[in-house]
Regions:
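A short helix-to-beta-strand connector/capping loop
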Residues: 26-27, 44, 68-70, 117-118
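Catalytic cysteine-centered active loop of the rhodanese-like fold, especially the PTP/DSP P-loop
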Residues: 74, 83-130
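Short acidic active-site motifs
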Residues: 35-36, 78-83
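Conserved beta-strand scaffold positions in the cores of enzyme catalytic domains, especially
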Residues: 30, 48, 71-73, 119-121
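Active-site neighborhoods of enzymes that stabilize oxyanions during catalysis
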Residues: 133-139
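A short alpha/beta connector and helix-capping loop motif
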Residues: 61-77
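Flexible, polar/low-complexity N-terminal or interdomain linker segments that lie immediately upstream
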Residues: 1-63
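Short, flexible helix/strand-to-coil boundary loops that buttress conserved ligand/catalytic motifs
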Residues: 61, 83, 133
Length: 139
C-alpha cells in the first residue's frame, strides 16, 4: 500500500476522532511526555503501543528517528485485529502514540470500546517526545 493510500485509509476509518482532535474537543484521556517519561522509568511502566507503520517505528520510513524504547509496534490499521493478543493488558495502563497525538486518540477509542480500562494517548505524540530530548531507538 502506498503512503497516500495508507493515509487515506486511516483518515477514512478515523476521521471523526481526527476532527475532534483538531478542534480540541475529544474528552479522551491523555498523558504528557513528561509524565510518560517518569512512568517509563518506574517499577510498573505502562504498555506503550506505537500505532505508526512498521517502517516509521523502525526509523526506515517517513519518521527516521525510530520509537520510544520498549514500545510495541501495532499499526493503527491492525489494532482492532490485535485486541485478542492484548487481553493480558486489559486492566493495565496502556499509552498509545503516534507522530503528533491525534491518531493515537482513535486508538484510545478502539481499546476503550473493547473494554480496556486505563488507556491514554501521548499528548503531542512522539514528535514532542523527541523534541524534549527523550530517548528513541531504531532497534
Amino acid at each position: 500500500m502506498s503512503e497516500s493510500e495508507y493515509v487515506f485509509t486511516v483518515f477514512k476509518r478515523h476521521w471523526k476522532t481526527l476532527i475532534k482532535w483538531l478542534l480540541h474537543i475529544t474528552g479522551l484521556p491523555e498523558i504528557t511526555v513528561d509524565e510518560l517519561f517518569e512512568r517509563v522509568n518506574s517499577d510498573q511502566p505502562p504498555l506503550m503501543i506505537d500505532i505508526r507503520s512498521a517502517e516509521d517505528f523502525n526509523g526506515t520510513g517517513y519518521s527516521t528517528y525510530g520509537h520510544i524504547p520498549n514500545a510495541r509496534s501495532i499499526d493503527i490499521l491492525q489494532l482492532e485485529s490485535s485486541i485478542e493478543d492484548l487481553q493480558p493488558f486489559k486492566d493495565k495502563e496502556i499509552v498509545t502514540m503516534c507522530p503528533g497525538g491525534g491518531l493515537s486518540l482513535a486508538a484510545v477509542e478502539i481499546l476503550t470500546e473493547a473494554g480496556f480500562k486505563d488507556v491514554k494517548s501521548l499528548k503531542g505524540g512522539i514528535g514532542l517526545w523527541r523534541k524534549k530530548g527523550y530517548p528513541t531507538t531504531t532497534s
